[in-house]
């Protein structure tokens, strides 16, 4: 939704200090250098950040704690994690048909995975906040500032559109809030109904050229549903689902503005990033002493970190020690994005070192970003067979390593 936002001319007052112990850690984190940040006026950005500090959160701590419990099941082999969504959301595409389509696809995939693996599937959408993009250069081939996502600037190739505008953070917040509200409505009002999802999968089998290979599986699922219906199974869990939201915690001013105090399951006061249920640190911003890694170490959310082909076992253990100091199963997700030609050689010693260190992390495959190349027309793309090869390599390694 392409809303315009009027930013108050007068700055809002600062928030009161955080409780002792948390304030010192917070100050240490925000004073650290952050890579991949916009070149906007910091005084204006500070004013916008103070607006974000006063708005209602997008998610709440009890939802975050619910996700943490489910990720603990994933880390201990009792559940499967499925994450999907847009590489980068846009304000223009943040509408009901697009969001419904993404959620419907995620739920359809979850049904097949749940049946095939006989395992609960934790559904994590890349939605309601994935508005920032890291870039390899500040400017494009035409000398314009590179597009860094709708939260920073516009994609149109003009000087004005590419200007870094901190007011866009409020637009990103408004769009994220609207998206998360719709996700909650969809998953509790029929879209997540198990019988409807199966019918949509049936339509895929009937209408897709690739559908024939899945017909036997669809028949098995249908037989299972018919059996439950005959037994009178009609629980609310068959008609609703929990979908959690996630994004890369890239933009320092935005993530800082969405921090709130809350309590965990044990009644301990913590800082939470209430822009999402889970946030992760990208491959380009994972400096151990920099802002991003130390920010996610500060918060009570479950967190992730992308590990590219340059990662070493020693580095991976350092990340585990910093981001999972209490050794909570599932608190940390390590996301392998190594490329199909590297995953089988780089990942095994990393898994071995982390497991031997006593951390029970979620191991996740991102087969998209390590297999990117630039086509002759200038567009970045991937070969599907290489994506599939990395996924297959990843799962073979997990079965032999864990």
Q: What are these regions, as identified by a protein language model?
A:
Residues 1-49:
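Intrinsically disordered, low-structural-confidence terminal and linker regions
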Residues 331-335, 340-363, 369-402:
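Non-transmembrane, aqueous-exposed alpha-helical and coiled segments at domain scale
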Residues 60-62, 84-85:
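N-terminal signal-anchor module of multipass membrane proteins
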Residues 88-89, 93-339, 379-382, 390, ...:
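Active-site-facing alpha/beta catalytic cores
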Residues 64-77:
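N-terminal amphipathic alpha-helix/helix-capping segment at the start of soluble metabolic enzymes
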Residues 51-58, 72-73, 81, 97, ...:
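C-terminal accessory/interaction regions of large nucleic acid-associated machines
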Residues 82-87, 124-127, 365-368:
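Short loop/turn segments at strand-loop or loop-helix junctions that form parts
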Residues 77-78, 363-365:
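Short coil-to-beta-strand
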